[in-house]
């Protein structure tokens, strides 16, 4: 591990020289490439340098223990346990930073939220979750744009909402939100006060570049239709809404939020490209079977990653066993504690796989 860290530090120093080289500065694309690599290595190099500094302090304390000065020996005895603990923490941090980086972490994302089991309640919770993610994005100063929304009949909920979220590190922060989110609450229409359980599926997909995912126009069937709002009423009189079917995979994407057919088509193609990239990534991870379903599940209540219990004001993430009694704040976008816990959990899992592999 430490020979690898020395190599990384050497490369970091080399990049610092390159970034001050006038011949590099004048070549914008090359400069940006080196600047990004330099930024990617910064955390690792800084932690490694702290590790070396603490290691040197431990060596110095051990030398004092071998000396004759009792006062200095006492100081060294007091400092050593804390220094060793600090060193162990830095070593664990280095192991995490050396893990293979997810190349999608810096990408923008598409967020898909769909109603599963639970009827009207599931549709209402689609809206609740969308507002939660939109508020979280707002806190991060990310940009949220609704690509498509399909209202459900009756109570003002949604069958589906698709949105793009653009901002630094969007995928790295949101990628573990994919799965089934379960809600337990008493519906407004429930006269007996019984708690109902509903489910909503969330999918987080990294945005794909056109170069990465090329789509043959001959593989597409494009249909146009009238946009409709709640209850099916027409919201404009032209065929501006677009439905694109990718014939080889059967994937279907609809977009009707823009008044322009061309804009709706462009947005739908972006979502389709992200879905196709999502499938490609899963194939590379040996998760070929039912690629979309493997991320979000079927929408059945039993396949849950997180439960939102309204009567108790409780939210539990079942993957990490974390329960927070701050439902209102969480639905208001305060989800960072879950995100940090999930990131640490999956990093630990990756470390386990490396040590056993």
From Swiss-Prot:
PTM comment: Methylated by PrmC. Methylation increases the termination efficiency of RF1.
SUPFAM superfamilies in UniProt: Release factor (SSF75620)
GO cellular component: cytoplasm
Locations listed in the record: Cytoplasm
Entry keywords, A to Z: Cytoplasm, Methylation, Protein biosynthesis
Family matches, as Gene3D superfamilies: 3.30.160.20, 3.30.70.1660, 6.10.140.1950
InterPro entries found in the cross-reference section: PCRF, Pep_chain_release_fac_I, Pep_chain_release_fac_I_sf, Prokaryotic/Mito_RF, RF-1
Name of this chain's protein: Peptide chain release factor 1
Function: Peptide chain release factor 1 directs the termination of translation in response to the peptide chain termination codons UAG and UAA.
One example GO MF annotation: translation release factor activity, codon specific
Domain of life: Bacteria
NCBIfam families in alphabetical order: prfA (TIGR00019), PRK00591.1 (NF001859)
Chain positions found as N5-methylglutamine: 233
Family per similarity comment: Belongs to the prokaryotic/mitochondrial release factor family.
Disulfide bond sites: none
């Amino acid at each position: 591990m430490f020979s690898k860290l020395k190599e990384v530090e050497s490369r970091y120093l080399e990049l610092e020289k390159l970034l001050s080289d006038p011949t590099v500065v004048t070549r914008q694309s090359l400069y940006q490439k080196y600047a990004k690599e330099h930024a990617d290595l910064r955390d690792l190099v800084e932690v490694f340098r702290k590790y070396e500094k603490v290691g040197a302090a431990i060596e110095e304390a051990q030398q004092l223990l071998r000396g004759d000065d009792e006062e200095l020996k006492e100081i060294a005895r007091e400092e050593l346990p804390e220094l060793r603990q600090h060193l162990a923490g830095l070593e664990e941090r280095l192991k995490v930073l050396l893990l293979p980086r997810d190349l999608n972490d810096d990408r923008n994302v598409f967020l898909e939220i769909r109603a599963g089991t639970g009827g009207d309640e599931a549709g209402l919770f689609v809206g609740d979750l969308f507002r939660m993610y939109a508020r979280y994005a707002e806190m991060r100063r990310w940009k949220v744009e609704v690509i498509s929304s399909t209202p459900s009949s009756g109570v003002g909920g949604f069958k589906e909402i698709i949105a793009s979220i653009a901002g630094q590190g969007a995928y790295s922060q949101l990628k573990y939100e994919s799965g089934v989110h379960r809600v337990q609450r008493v519906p407004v229409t429930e006269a007996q006060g019984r708690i109902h359980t509903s489910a909503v599926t969330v999918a987080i997909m990294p945005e794909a570049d056109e170069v990465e995912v090329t789509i043959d126009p001959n593989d597409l069937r494009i249909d146009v239709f009238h946009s409709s709002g709640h209850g099916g009423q027409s919201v404009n009189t032209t065929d501006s809404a677009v439905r694109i079917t990718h014939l080889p995979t059967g994937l279907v994407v609809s977009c009707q939020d823009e008044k322009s057919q061309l804009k709706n088509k462009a947005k739908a193609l972006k979502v389709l490209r992200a879905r196709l990239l999502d499938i490609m990534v899963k194939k590379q991870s040996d998760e070929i079977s039912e690629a979309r379903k493997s991320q979000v599940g079927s929408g059945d209540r039993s396949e849950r990653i997180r439960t939102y219990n309204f009567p108790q004001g409780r939210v539990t993430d079942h993957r990490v066993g974390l329960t927070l009694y701050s439902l209102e704040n969480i639905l208001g976008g305060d989800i960072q504690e879950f995100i940090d816990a999930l990131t640490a959990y999956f990093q630990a899992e990756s470390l386990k796989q490396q040590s056993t592999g």
